[in-house]
Regions:
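Glycine- and aromatic-enriched membrane insertion/assembly motifs of diderm outer-membrane
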Residues: 43-100
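Outer-membrane beta-barrel transmembrane domain signature
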Residues: 1-51, 109-184, 193-197
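Flexible, solvent-exposed coil segments and beta strand-coil junctions
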Residues: 64-69, 103-108, 168-173
Length: 197
């Protein structure tokens, strides 16, 4: 489940764009092919009591050693609001012949807040995976390009960010902590991941 936590600032197009584009941690180093991820990302806003949520559960599948697909369809109701998120993307792994530790990804997310607005988002990322003992670390850069349509006018923009994450094996699943940030926003993500052969 992916959740963006906030109020007025969280409802801005740039903030929503960054909140709904959480990356799927499909590990390029191990050989497992199917991934299921449940995550919660949020932005902390001191002094605010109102929260807006954006849930998501998604999957990833390695088509080959250096190519993976990701996607999800999630509908969620909160009070009198009903929201739908549809996402799909591709990840390409590259690096040395024996270790594909670099990842470039392209993802499109369509967020529909019924009776309020639609937001279409394209995310481009470049990241590096590093293994230390049993843990994995990932860092990279990315950009979101969004279009918000509130049925009266359209608003376009771009959000650039830095990505840092840690993936820790716990029993039969993995726990991930991720940060996406720029000079204006700071998002946290907590994820549970399960991979299969």
């Amino acid at each position: 489940m992916q959740i963006l936590n906030g109020s007025n600032e969280a409802k801005s197009p740039s903030s929503i764009s960054l909140g709904i584009s959480n990356s799927y941690a499909i590990n390029p180093i191990n050989t497992n092919r199917l991934y299921i991820q449940s995550s919660m990302s949020f932005k902390s806003l001191p002094g605010r009591n109102n929260y807006q949520y954006y849930p998501d559960i998604g999957f990833g599948y390695k088509v080959s050693k250096n190519l993976a697909l990701e996607g999800s369809v999630f509908n969620h109701s909160f009070g009198s609001f009903s929201d739908q998120t549809i996402r799909g993307g591709v990840q390409y792994y590259f690096g040395s012949s024996d270790t594909l530790s670099w990842v470039s990804s392209l993802k499109k997310v369509s967020y529909k807040s019924v009776k309020n607005f639609n937001l279409n988002n394209i995310t481009i990322e470049l990241s590096k995976w590093i293994k230390y003992r049993q843990n994995f670390f990932r860092f990279g850069l990315g950009s979101n390009f969004y279009t918000k349509d509130n049925f009266l006018f359209k608003q376009k923009g771009q959000v650039n960010f830095i990505l840092l994450s840690t993936i820790i094996p716990v029993s039969f699943f993995q726990l991930s902590f991720e940060t996406r940030m720029n000079l204006d926003m700071f998002f946290y993500s907590f994820s549970l991941l399960k991979d299969f052969h």
